[in-house]
Amino acid sequence: MRQALILFLLILTLFAGPAHGQKSGQPEPKFQAAMPGYTYQFPRDDFSHDDFRIEWWYYTGNLESETGRRFGYQMTFFRVGLEGDQPIDNPSKWKVDHIYFAHMTVSDIQNKNFHFFERINRKGIKNAGAESDRFKIWNSDWSLTADGNTQKIIAQENATGIELNLTPIKKRVFHGKNGISVKGSDKGNASHYFSFTRMKTEGSVFIKGENFKVTGTSWM
């Protein structure tokens, strides 16, 4: 777990910088920077944006079974663009232009157990991906999709995981100024950032093969 987190932080360090400020005579950067003036369009902006270097979909929530047993969960899908400013034309299905990370945790409050799982895959051979024309993100058989206003998370590993339907019950919140969350003083060192702060959640939590029907609330 620690090695994977270090790897992810290293990739963020290498590729999260603003895609601007190129020296004269160099090609224009491939990736856009998060700049003021962006006009959000939904549901399009719930989908993937491959012209930005880093993107993630993050969920966390508190759940309770029909018998009152409590659980917590966290689910995150990451996309990191790797081609850089001068992509190489490579027709191979094995080429790596994006790497996809996924983290899932389940907290079993009653038994004081914390379950953590992660995946790292490439896009080229469809082991993972994030669509730009519809709400579909996946990493192997873990997935995040939508049916109308309801989002669905499916993720299991070693018979432990979640299958949840999440429906917003509060309006979308934009962080920072007009959805621009500033990360530093340099121009473009920011992210487009919005959330659903309360989502009705129902479905199943799986603990080593045991299925618990649950309800609760989540934050995206």
Predicted regions and their residues:
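Positively charged n-region of N-terminal signal peptides that target proteins for export
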Residues: 1-4
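Bacterial N-terminal signal peptides
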Residues: 6-15
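Targeting-peptide/extracellular-domain and disordered-appendage signature
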Residues: 21-220
